[in-house]
Protein backbone atom coordinates (compact mmCIF):
# COMPACT_ATOMS: atom_id res chain seq x y z
CA UNK A 1 0.00 0.00 0.00
CA UNK A 2 2.99 2.31 0.44
CA UNK A 3 3.84 1.91 -3.24
CA UNK A 4 0.21 2.60 -4.16
CA UNK A 5 0.13 5.78 -2.04
CA UNK A 6 3.48 6.93 -3.42
CA UNK A 7 2.15 6.55 -6.96
CA UNK A 8 -0.98 8.55 -6.09
CA UNK A 9 1.16 11.34 -4.67
CA UNK A 10 3.81 11.20 -7.40
CA UNK A 11 6.62 10.04 -5.09
CA UNK A 12 9.09 7.93 -7.06
CA UNK A 13 9.98 4.63 -5.36
CA UNK A 14 13.17 2.64 -5.73
CA UNK A 15 13.58 -1.01 -4.67
CA UNK A 16 16.98 -2.73 -4.61
CA UNK A 17 17.39 -6.43 -3.83
CA UNK A 18 13.83 -6.68 -2.53
CA UNK A 19 14.36 -3.73 -0.15
CA UNK A 20 12.77 -0.32 -0.50
CA UNK A 21 15.07 2.71 -0.61
CA UNK A 22 13.52 5.03 1.98
CA UNK A 23 14.30 8.67 1.31
CA UNK A 24 12.84 11.53 3.42
CA UNK A 25 9.59 11.66 1.44
CA UNK A 26 9.12 7.90 1.50
CA UNK A 27 9.71 7.79 5.27
CA UNK A 28 6.95 10.37 5.78
CA UNK A 29 4.63 8.26 3.63
CA UNK A 30 5.64 5.09 5.50
CA UNK A 31 4.71 6.70 8.83
CA UNK A 32 1.31 7.70 7.47
CA UNK A 33 0.54 4.45 5.66
CA UNK A 34 1.99 1.84 8.04
CA UNK A 35 1.07 3.38 11.40
CA UNK A 36 -2.09 5.06 10.15
CA UNK A 37 -3.91 3.45 7.25
CA UNK A 38 -2.73 -0.17 7.36
CA UNK A 39 -2.58 -0.55 11.14
CA UNK A 40 -6.05 0.96 11.55
CA UNK A 41 -7.55 -1.28 8.86
CA UNK A 42 -6.06 -4.38 10.50
CA UNK A 43 -7.39 -3.30 13.91
CA UNK A 44 -10.87 -2.81 12.42
CA UNK A 45 -10.82 -6.36 11.03
CA UNK A 46 -9.86 -7.77 14.42
CA UNK A 47 -12.58 -5.71 16.11
CA UNK A 48 -15.12 -7.07 13.62
CA UNK A 49 -14.14 -10.55 14.80
CA UNK A 50 -14.38 -9.65 18.49
CA UNK A 51 -10.62 -9.59 19.08
CA UNK A 52 -9.24 -6.83 21.30
CA UNK A 53 -6.24 -5.53 19.36
CA UNK A 54 -4.04 -2.49 19.93
CA UNK A 55 -2.05 -0.75 17.22
CA UNK A 56 1.61 0.01 17.85
CA UNK A 57 4.78 0.64 15.97
CA UNK A 58 8.23 -0.45 17.07
CA UNK A 59 8.74 3.12 18.28
CA UNK A 60 6.00 2.82 20.93
CA UNK A 61 7.25 1.96 24.40
CA UNK A 62 10.73 1.29 23.03
CA UNK A 63 9.58 -2.09 21.73
CA UNK A 64 12.15 -2.01 18.95
CA UNK A 65 15.54 -0.31 18.90
CA UNK A 66 17.02 0.04 15.45
CA UNK A 67 20.05 1.47 13.73
CA UNK A 68 20.46 2.82 10.23
CA UNK A 69 21.47 0.11 7.78
CA UNK A 70 24.89 0.92 6.33
CA UNK A 71 25.33 1.14 2.55
CA UNK A 72 25.83 -2.31 1.05
CA UNK A 73 27.02 -3.88 -2.19
CA UNK A 74 24.14 -5.24 -4.24
CA UNK A 75 24.46 -7.33 -7.39
CA UNK A 76 22.01 -6.54 -10.18
CA UNK A 77 21.45 -10.04 -11.52
CA UNK A 78 20.06 -8.79 -14.82
CA UNK A 79 23.15 -6.71 -15.67
CA UNK A 80 25.78 -8.47 -13.55
CA UNK A 81 26.86 -5.10 -12.14
CA UNK A 82 27.54 -4.70 -8.42
CA UNK A 83 26.79 -1.29 -6.95
CA UNK A 84 26.98 0.17 -3.45
CA UNK A 85 23.47 1.16 -2.37
CA UNK A 86 22.42 3.41 0.50
CA UNK A 87 18.86 2.42 1.44
CA UNK A 88 18.30 5.72 3.26
CA UNK A 89 16.06 5.59 6.34
CA UNK A 90 16.03 1.79 6.41
CA UNK A 91 16.89 0.28 9.76
CA UNK A 92 18.11 -2.97 11.19
CA UNK A 93 16.78 -4.32 14.48
CA UNK A 94 19.34 -3.97 17.28
CA UNK A 95 17.16 -4.90 20.25
CA UNK A 96 13.63 -5.99 21.07
CA UNK A 97 12.06 -5.11 24.42
CA UNK A 98 9.08 -7.44 24.50
CA UNK A 99 7.81 -6.33 27.92
CA UNK A 100 5.04 -4.07 26.53
CA UNK A 101 3.94 -6.81 24.14
CA UNK A 102 3.88 -9.33 26.99
CA UNK A 103 1.85 -6.99 29.25
CA UNK A 104 -0.70 -6.50 26.48
CA UNK A 105 -0.95 -10.19 25.65
CA UNK A 106 -1.18 -11.17 29.34
CA UNK A 107 -4.14 -8.79 29.66
CA UNK A 108 -6.04 -10.13 26.67
CA UNK A 109 -4.91 -7.64 24.01
CA UNK A 110 -3.37 -8.53 20.68
CA UNK A 111 -0.59 -6.10 19.71
CA UNK A 112 -0.46 -5.21 16.01
CA UNK A 113 2.91 -3.68 15.16
CA UNK A 114 3.60 -1.56 12.13
CA UNK A 115 7.08 -1.81 10.65
CA UNK A 116 8.66 1.34 12.03
CA UNK A 117 11.38 1.54 14.66
CA UNK A 118 13.70 4.16 16.12
CA UNK A 119 17.20 4.51 17.47
CA UNK A 120 18.04 5.93 20.90
CA UNK A 121 18.10 9.44 19.41
CA UNK A 122 14.52 9.17 18.11
CA UNK A 123 15.47 8.77 14.43
CA UNK A 124 12.68 6.74 12.82
CA UNK A 125 13.43 3.93 10.38
CA UNK A 126 11.47 1.80 7.94
CA UNK A 127 12.16 -1.84 8.82
CA UNK A 128 11.13 -4.93 6.93
CA UNK A 129 7.99 -6.36 8.57
CA UNK A 130 9.11 -9.98 8.17
CA UNK A 131 12.37 -9.14 9.96
CA UNK A 132 10.47 -7.50 12.83
CA UNK A 133 8.13 -10.49 13.11
CA UNK A 134 11.08 -12.89 13.32
CA UNK A 135 12.88 -10.78 15.93
CA UNK A 136 9.75 -10.48 18.07
CA UNK A 137 9.09 -14.22 17.79
CA UNK A 138 12.61 -14.87 19.10
CA UNK A 139 12.20 -12.34 21.95
CA UNK A 140 8.88 -13.94 22.95
CA UNK A 141 10.33 -17.45 22.60
CA UNK A 142 7.41 -18.25 20.31
CA UNK A 143 6.90 -21.85 19.28
CA UNK A 144 6.01 -20.84 15.72
CA UNK A 145 6.29 -17.90 13.36
CA UNK A 146 3.80 -17.77 10.51
CA UNK A 147 4.55 -15.26 7.75
CA UNK A 148 1.78 -14.28 5.39
CA UNK A 149 2.46 -13.25 1.83
CA UNK A 150 0.71 -12.22 -1.33
CA UNK A 151 2.53 -14.98 -3.21
CA UNK A 152 1.52 -18.63 -3.26
CA UNK A 153 4.69 -19.98 -1.66
CA UNK A 154 8.38 -20.59 -2.21
CA UNK A 155 9.33 -22.20 -5.49
CA UNK A 156 12.67 -23.73 -6.42
CA UNK A 157 11.81 -22.57 -9.94
CA UNK A 158 9.28 -19.69 -10.03
CA UNK A 159 8.26 -20.74 -13.56
CA UNK A 160 7.37 -24.28 -12.44
CA UNK A 161 4.27 -24.64 -10.21
CA UNK A 162 5.33 -28.19 -9.34
CA UNK A 163 8.52 -26.89 -7.68
CA UNK A 164 6.63 -25.35 -4.73
CA UNK A 165 8.14 -26.48 -1.44
CA UNK A 166 6.48 -26.83 1.95
CA UNK A 167 9.63 -27.17 4.08
CA UNK A 168 12.93 -25.43 3.57
CA UNK A 169 16.10 -26.16 5.56
CA UNK A 170 18.14 -23.08 6.48
CA UNK A 171 21.03 -24.13 4.23
CA UNK A 172 18.66 -24.36 1.25
CA UNK A 173 17.19 -20.93 2.04
CA UNK A 174 20.71 -19.48 1.97
CA UNK A 175 21.39 -21.17 -1.37
CA UNK A 176 18.20 -19.73 -2.89
CA UNK A 177 19.32 -16.22 -1.92
CA UNK A 178 22.98 -16.63 -2.90
CA UNK A 179 22.18 -18.23 -6.25
CA UNK A 180 19.76 -15.45 -7.19
CA UNK A 181 16.83 -17.84 -7.47
CA UNK A 182 15.05 -15.95 -4.68
CA UNK A 183 14.15 -12.48 -5.91
CA UNK A 184 12.30 -9.34 -4.85
CA UNK A 185 10.34 -9.45 -1.61
CA UNK A 186 11.07 -13.16 -1.14
CA UNK A 187 14.68 -12.32 -0.18
CA UNK A 188 13.86 -10.54 3.10
CA UNK A 189 11.27 -13.22 3.93
CA UNK A 190 13.91 -15.94 3.60
CA UNK A 191 16.50 -13.83 5.45
CA UNK A 192 14.10 -13.44 8.38
CA UNK A 193 13.88 -17.22 8.66
CA UNK A 194 17.63 -17.77 8.58
What would you call each of these model-derived segments?
Residues 1-194:
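Nucleotide/pyrophosphate-binding catalytic subdomain
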Amino acid sequence: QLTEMAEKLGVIQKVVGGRRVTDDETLELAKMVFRGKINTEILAQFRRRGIKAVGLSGVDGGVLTAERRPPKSVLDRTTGVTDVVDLGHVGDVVKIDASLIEVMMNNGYLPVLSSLGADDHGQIFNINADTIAAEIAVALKAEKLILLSDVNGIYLDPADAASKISRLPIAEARKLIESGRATGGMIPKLESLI
